[in-house]
C-alpha cells in the first residue's frame, strides 16, 4: 500500500449495516470528514517542528460495549516517540504508516509488537486507497475501490499516545501483506 487513502462519502450507518457482525454503538457519531487524498501525518517544513500536519483515518475499535467508530492519527506512534513522529538514531523519520506482517518469526517489527501483544487491533475504514505503478515515470495512480461493499475495512494496529498538548490520541498503522494478483499487476509489492 502506497500510503494514500480516501474517506469520501463514507457513512457509519452504511458500514455497520454492511458489516453485520460489528456491534454498533447506541448512537453513531457524525460521519467521517469527506476527504479524497489522505496521507500520513508529516512536517510541512522539516526544520520547523511546529509545522506538523496531523492526519487521521476513520477506524473502528473494540470496547467492552461495542465496536466504536473513532479517528486515529496516521501513522502509528511507537512508545519511544510519544507525541511525535518516530525517528531513527540518525534523526531521519521512520515510516510507521504500514505494519508489514512477516511470514516467519515475530509477526511484526519490534516497533509494533507492544501494541500487538496488548491486543490493540482496529479496523481502518476507507472508501478507497491509492496504489502507484512505480514501474513507469511519471508514476500512475490507481484508486482501488471495493466492488461489493460501501468501504474497505482494513486490518490495523493501534496505540494511544500522549500528544504535545497533553491529550491522549489513538494512532494507527495499516497491516500489509503480500499483494494479490490485481495489485501485483499495477506493480506493487504490499497490500492492505
Predicted regions and their residues:
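Short linear sequence motif anchored by a di-proline
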Residues: 1-192
Amino acid at each position: 500500500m502506497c500510503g494514500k487513502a480516501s474517506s469520501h462519502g463514507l457513512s457509519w450507518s452504511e458500514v455497520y449495516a454492511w458489516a453485520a457482525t460489528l456491534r454498533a454503538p447506541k448512537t453513531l457519531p457524525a460521519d467521517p470528514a469527506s476527504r479524497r487524498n489522505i496521507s500520513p501525518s508529516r512536517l510541512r517544513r522539516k526544520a520547523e517542528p511546529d509545522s506538523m500536519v496531523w492526519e487521521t483515518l476513520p477506524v473502528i475499535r473494540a470496547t467492552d460495549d461495542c465496536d466504536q467508530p473513532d479517528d486515529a492519527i496516521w501513522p502509528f506512534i511507537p512508545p519511544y516517540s510519544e507525541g511525535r513522529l518516530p525517528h531513527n538514531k540518525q534523526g531521519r523519520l521512520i515510516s510507521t504508516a504500514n505494519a508489514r506482517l512477516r511470514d516467519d518469526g515475530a509477526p511484526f517489527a519490534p516497533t509494533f509488537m507492544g501494541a500487538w501483544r496488548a491486543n490493540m487491533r482496529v479496523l481502518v475504514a476507507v472508501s478507497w486507497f491509492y496504489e502507484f505503478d512505480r514501474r513507469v515515470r511519471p508514476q500512475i495512480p490507481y484508486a482501488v475501490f471495493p466492488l461489493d461493499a460501501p468501504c474497505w475495512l482494513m486490518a490495523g494496529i493501534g496505540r494511544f499516545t500522549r500528544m504535545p498538548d497533553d491529550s491522549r490520541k489513538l494512532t494507527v498503522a495499516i497491516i500489509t501483506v503480500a499483494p494479490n494478483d490485481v495489485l501485483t499487476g499495477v506493480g506493487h509489492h504490499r497490500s492492505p
